[in-house]
Amino acid sequence: MKKGFTKIISFVLCFAMLLSCGSVVSFAAEESGVSFGDSIAKGFYNALNGIVEGLVSAICKLYPNPADWQNLSDYDSDEVGFMAGRDTYQKGAEEGNFWSLGYASLSILPDDVDEGKYNLGRDLMNKIAEGVYDDQRVRVAVIDDNSGEGAVVMGAIDGMGLTSTDVRAIRAGVLAYCEEIGFDVASINFSATHAHSVLDTQGVSTEFFKKLLLGFAYNAMGKTESVPGMEAADYFKQYFIAQSIEAVKLAIADMESGKLYFDEIDFSEFIKDKRGLIAKEDVPATAALCFVPDSGSEMTYITDITCHATSFSASNGLVGSDYIYYMDQYLKEQTGANLVMVPGAVGQMSRDIEVDTTGMTEWEDMGASAKALGAEFAKLVLAADFSNELDPVLNVTHKEIFITPENSILVLACEIRLVNNKVFLDNNGNALMPSEMGYLEFGNEFAFAIMPAEFYPETFWDDEITNGTTWDGTEWPYDSLSEAVEGVTIYPISITNDALGYVLTDNNFAFMGHIIGEEIADEVLSVGKHMGSFLVEEYYEMIADFVK
């Protein structure tokens, strides 16, 4: 056992070093051929992919499974907190239907955040927050068409990601409250805004090596409690879960009647594809809802933005929730309006804005890009033409999915309890991860596809926007998911109700070819090569079962 344990440590150290290496480019599908050098490089990386997967898979077999991993036969949808949504698909507004919405926003920062004991959720390097630059919040909108089918909760938490386990803990608290007050809710959804410089909401930045080392012994002894040193991280999780439940309660109490409007907004002026594959004119548009209360009180905007929240650097050592905070702030200052921002198919999409920091203090300079980007996004929302009033028709469904990881790094992360996703074992002892996806439609005109992972734009909108870029030379066989329901335009929400890494098109999954070749480490945080096609197929099946 000691020899095997040493191999585990050695491999993880070597793998961490690999993440800092060099550059090779994917090729486009329409190219007639590939150079000999590219063929050699691809062959090398493909071989390396097999070696790495073989090594990590072997480590997973050596590493004891946590005692609370269950057999798939013991899986219970209600017990784990899955919600199926509404029973029927409404094709029009019934008499008496009307929109109502309530909003709430709370800080999720603990009072002792300045004491240097909480982790920033950026990477495995155990970065500690030394203070606060702006805030870290949960924002919630509760929406209903008052058809008697149940309301929908849309929540967004400033964070890199949220595990399904924690989302379902929030659900349990909300459902208990709703039962207590007699409030019917059909769907409870929480997204991570994907801010890279806030406290760790997922667990990925909390003492990786300590969990790796002590987790082996804990698992072998059947112990399920956290390893020593996790007290602050565990407290923060419980705190943001409690604050999220409280925010939903406040939003329910805030509900009032009004009108709901929709518009599509072009944010491409301030967004770019870091890979250079998606041209400005092909950057997907943003969906935006605007709720206007009958009482004349503050409006609420809900937007999905296809842009990474990486304008404020985690290297500052301060909690900063990036452009989301300043977009929210600008809307409030200008109109008093509320905001729920959920992430679109963010993939490698990032900011494209230049800020003149001449004359700024070091403190001002830190947040200059985030402030400017948030303000520009807010201006575009305020300038939008919200003249398209939506009929009070709300449709929502969810589908349970069971994912077999092709990337054993994800299994290892669960084995060492780096993340707390629930894992079940099939009859052959293979790990399965339960998760979910959803479909949320407004007015029979526009909808959100709710996805448990971080989609690349081309995986959702089809790879024409990347000129058919492929790693393995095959084609991506799916059309845009945005047109899956006739008469409805659909937009993606990523990292919602779970955080299962990146979702590329199957044919452009290169793993080490991108990690080493292009210094893009996304695929180390992916379920595997076929995650894209798996989710797309499950999505179409969900739609076919619901929209009849």
Model region roles, listed by residue range:
Residues 381:
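Glycan-recognition surfaces in beta-rich domains, encompassing non-catalytic CBMs
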Residues 377:
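Anionic-ligand-binding alpha/beta catalytic cores of soluble enzymes and soluble regulatory domains
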Residues 1-12:
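Bacterial N-terminal signal peptides that target proteins for export
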Residues 19-32:
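Sec-dependent signal peptide cleavage junction
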Residues 33-191, 195-372, 385-548:
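Conserved beta-alpha junction segments in alpha/beta enzyme cores
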